[in-house]
Amino acid sequence: MAPAATASTGTKGIVRQVIGPVLDVEFPAGKLPKILNALRIEGKNPAGQDIGLTAEVQQLLGDHRVRAVAMSGTDGLVRGMEAVDTGAPISVPVGEATLGRIFNVLGEPVDEQGPIKSSTTSPIHRSAPKLTDLETKPKVFETGIKVIDLLAPYRQGGKVGLFGGAGVGKTVLIQELINNIAKEHGGVSVFGGVGERTREGNDLYEEFKESGVINADNLTESKVALCFGQMNEPPGARMRVGLSALTMAEHFRDVNKQDVLLFIDNIFRFVQAGSEVSALLGRMPSAVGYQPTLGTDVGELQERITSTLEGSITSIQAVYVPADDLTDPAPATTFAHLDATTVLARALAAKGIYPAVDPLDSTSTMLQPAVVGDEHYRTARAVQSTLQRYKELQDIIAILGLDELSEEDRKTFDRARKIEKFLSQPFFVAEIFTGMSGKYVKLEETIAGFNMILSGELDNLPEQAFYLVGNIEEVKAKAQKINSENKG
């Protein structure tokens, strides 16, 4: 057996085996690197190719060997090349210099804007804040999106999951939230692109430049830092890029004492990458082929995302749901860490209700009278019970027809359809697709609007007037326009 690992900077080892993104490196006796240390491999291979990659130590194998996972492609890497122990985990730049820039998992800029003007770096592996340092007073975080603010309000400094299958609008909803929050709340955001499409990263960057969240002419005025580990990158990069983004956000919270927003798209890809790495390291798979350390991997990331007495990190995370199955181990494990869940439903997207947020499946720990107040709570519960009754009535209508409903049920049915339509909203980031200008709706206007529908004040207005509008005044204006068109 190899002697116990000791701290060593600059110790040189030799690459003995390369299996895809995993490599075994042999070090001198007594000078093994610690687990999670970064190894650097640079030089030319026998074919004359330039090689430069970083790998993270994952296992100590015995016989003076360690097994490491590469953070970039291992093409051209050969046995016998030299690997240097850096003596520390992967570190990324932090602070104001990161705003307006795009980084990879190693904190290297990939936006062709030149080197980072910051000497401050921070390791991506850190402990979660102590229990005594945590902020425990709940405070609602307004998003300007009606369905979220009314039925599943977000907590400042909390963790929110956007759950949905492929193509139901998770990334668009995240883009809208970034846009609304940057305009209404100010403050800084960090975006972690974990295993998603390269095109989406490019679209997001261009969207930020257009909306002014990134000022390309003066980066110091930018409000967001981006960290990408895309689909085409090795599993090591996709597994660690979430931690790189989180480390940048932690600096704004702990050192600058700011309230920060952390967006992660997509947590499922983080789990998926961990599963790939686990298999490459030879671990026995667990349920549905996931890694046996699934709970630990997710917990280590999620427990660092929290509010302290100094500042807060409010995290909004997209969670892909494989085959729309919420009981899959990846989304099910993530559920346990969240303060609010926003579930996107394919059935609503098919009806053209956007955002396609399921008002009955979405939940929040903030929806209680002591936090949001009695009026908000009563309105939200009345909306949900009306929609639940609507769901039950649909089965009756399918069998007996609409004419068989009682007068009371007919009213409930009509109001529920108006509520469903009124939960839709035009987005700023989707203006190019819809041709409609986006709307930010204040919470008071949202509550007042739904109260008017529930009370029957708007029973005489046509249903289509409630579709893709902001507040209730816009509904009335749209209804007037529809009536005048019908008369004409």
UniProtKB/Swiss-Prot annotation:
Give the membrane topology, semicolon-separated if more than one: Peripheral membrane protein
Q: Which Gene3D superfamilies match?
A: 2.40.10.170, Bovine Mitochondrial F1-atpase, Atp Synthase Beta Chain, Chain D, domain 3 (1.10.1140.10), P-loop containing nucleotide triphosphate hydrolases (3.40.50.300)
Principal localisation: membrane
A Gene Ontology MF term for this entry?
ATP hydrolysis activity
InterPro entries according to UniProt: AAA+_ATPase, ATP-synt_VA_C, ATP_synth_F1_bsu, ATPase_a/bsu_AS, ATPase_alpha/beta_chains, ATPase_F1/V1/A1_a/bsu_N, ATPase_F1/V1/A1_a/bsu_N_sf, ATPase_F1/V1/A1_a/bsu_nucl-bd
Highest taxon, organism lineage: Bacteria
Q: Which UniProt keywords apply?
A: ATP synthesis, ATP-binding, CF(1), Hydrogen ion transport, Ion transport, Membrane, Nucleotide-binding, Thylakoid, Translocase, Transport
The family database entries (NCBIfam families) matched by this protein are listed as: atpD
Which family does the similarity line name?
Belongs to the ATPase alpha/beta chains family.
Recorded protein name is ATP synthase subunit beta
Q: Which gene encodes it?
A: atpD
